[in-house]
Each structure stands twice: as C-alpha cells, then as structure tokens.
C-alpha cells in the first residue's frame, strides 16, 4: 500500500446525474423475453443492479425483498425447487457475507439452480469497507457446486448472463457496471464457462487477469513489449471451475507468471492459479497483483487502485521482478 495525495474528487460521486449504460439489465430483459421461468429478486437496489427494466416490464416476475439478503436467498432457493430460475441481485459484499449461510445451505448444498448477481466488486465503490467486496471470490470458491464468473467488462456481460442461465446449477456472477457506452468498434467477447480466453500472445511471461484488471494487464503487456518483453495475457473469466489444463500449459511454456485481480490476494484468482499449478507439480511461484492482507478505505476507484497497488505500472514492476527469477519448465 502506497501513500497518495488526497483530493476532494476522490471522495465525490462524479456520476450522480450521469446516465450509465445498463448492459446487464438489457441482457437480463432479453433473456426473460425468451424464457418465462426467469424471475428476478432484489434487495431494495433495483436501479444500482439494473433490475428496474425487468421490474417495469415483468412486475409479476419481479420480487423486491427489502434489505434482507438472507431471506431473499432462501426464497430464491424455494422458487428454484418449484422450477423457476431465480436471478438474485444485490451488491457483492451483501450477497456473500450477509447471506453466506443461506447461500451455502440452501443454494450450494442442494445444487439449486439459483443465479447470484453481485455488483460493486472489490475497489469499485467509494463507500468504504462496509461495501467493498474484497473477499467474495474466496468465499464463493470455497463452496462446493458453486460456479464463479467475473466478465472482463461490458463487452462480455451479455455472454456471461446467457452462460449463467445455461449452466445447470448455482452461479455467482461478479459484475462491474459500465460507466460509458461501448464504442462501435468494440469486439463483443464470448464467455465459455471453464475456458480461459487468450487476448495476447508472447513467450516471455504470462499474466492471468480477471474483471477490470484485464485491461490493465493488456496495457502492461504493451509497455513491456516496448522493452522487448513479449507477454501472453489471459482473461480468466471463470474462476471456478478454472481451466487448469490451459493454465498449466501456458505457464509451462513461458516459465514466469503473474495474476492480477480486483480482490484480496488471499483466496482469489492467484490462489486458484497456484492450486492448478501445484496439483500438476509445476514448481513456479505465482506472483500476485491484488489487495494485500488488509481492508481498504473509502475513495474513488482510480484513487483506490493506485493506493493499493492495482495499477498498470504495478503489473509492469511485478513482471520485471519475476522475469529475473524465471524458470523454464520442461
């Protein structure tokens, strides 16, 4: 964690009056048009979770449950047993910490076909420690039967929602809301559960990233390329079940690796990659860019990412360090 200069803008919500794109809400709406079994539950957060589209069009399939996440998850489990496909919405931290026992006992254990949709992952909220989900991936990874997905950005949300729907069982979908419209030349990304996506190829180093850290990993790879270091960048959108076979193959080829995540380095992507390598007896240290063993503080996302070492330059610095210790695996 580094010292940073504080500015008023770092503690001010700049998008209060801004029209924010609603890629998730539109994707859920389109899905609901085709499948009448889909129902939506919300913990008094319809606009922030983009479920107001669904509420206004399908009021008889929308259930506002109040700020009672544990009860909401229990209700969703019962609805799933009756044949509905519940999409359950709140902020990541509330779905995971507050309702964890219900998620474990009423969703994961019976393999209920419930889709848990969490917003405000990691350091993407200025509301401080009570709203920052820095351990949600760790909590959900630990649950048997739970699928954990984090799309890289708005260009992958539609595919992520459809993949979650098609998955037979519980899914935790970790979403960061888009702040701007996608440009017309943005390539829409497909999401195949359990399969990584290689976005850049190189022989010197491999960076595994998820969520908003993918773009920072790609920017870091470009900077490294200018110094003659060619990097493979991998979008690990499915953290569980993870694509261990491809991960091991890529690391064995490059011999040096970094993970980058908007999450604690404990229990998240870094641990998942380490586990995959360890089980194949690949003896390479996984160098991690993420939140160290600490809580965060309030502030804007750029301020927090800089303070806690999750910026592009942090990935570059970590890459230069790990390359000095590179081991080629045969």
Per-range role (PLM):
Residues 1-174, 179, 190, ...:
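Thiamine diphosphate
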């Amino acid at each position: 964690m580094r010292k940073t200069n504080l500015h008023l803008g770092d503690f001010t919500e700049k998008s209060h009056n801004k029209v924010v794109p609603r890629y998730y809400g539109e994707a859920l709406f389109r899905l609901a048009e085709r499948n009448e079994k889909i129902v939506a539950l919300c913990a008094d957060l319809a606009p922030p979770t983009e479920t107001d589209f669904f509420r206004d069009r399908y009021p008889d399939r929308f259930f506002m449950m109040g700020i009672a996440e544990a009860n909401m998850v229990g209700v969703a489990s019962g609805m799933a047993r009756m044949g509905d496909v519940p999409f359950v919405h709140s902020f990541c931290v509330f779905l995971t910490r507050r309702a964890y026992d219900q998620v474990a006992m009423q969703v994961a254990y019976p393999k209920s076909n419930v889709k848990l949709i969490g917003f405000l992952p990691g350091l993407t909220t200025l509301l401080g420690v009570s709203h920052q989900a820095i351990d949600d991936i760790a909590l959900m990874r630990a649950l048997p039967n739970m699928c954990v997905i984090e799309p890289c950005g708005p260009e992958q949300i539609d595919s992520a929602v459809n993949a979650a729907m098609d998955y037979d069982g519980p899914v935790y979908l970790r979403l960061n809301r888009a702040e701007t419209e996608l440009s017309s030349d943005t390539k829409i990304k497909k999401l195949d559960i359990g399969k990584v996506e290689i976005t850049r190829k190189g022989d010197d180093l491999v960076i595994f990233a998820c969520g908003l850290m993918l773009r920072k990993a790609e920017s870091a790879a470009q900077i490294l390329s200018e110094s003659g270091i060619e990097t493979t960048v991998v979008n690990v959108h499915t953290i569980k079940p993870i694509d261990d076979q491809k991960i091991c193959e890529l690391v064995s080829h490059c011999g040096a690796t970094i993970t980058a995540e908007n999450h604690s380095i404990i229990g998240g992507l870094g641990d998942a990659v380490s586990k995959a390598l360890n089980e194949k007896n690949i003896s390479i240290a996984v160098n991690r860019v993420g939140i160290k063993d600490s809580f965060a503080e309030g502030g804007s996302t750029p301020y927090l990412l800089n303070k806690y070492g999750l910026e592009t330059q942090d990935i570059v610095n970590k890459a230069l360090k790990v390359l000095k210790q590179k081991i080629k695996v045969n």
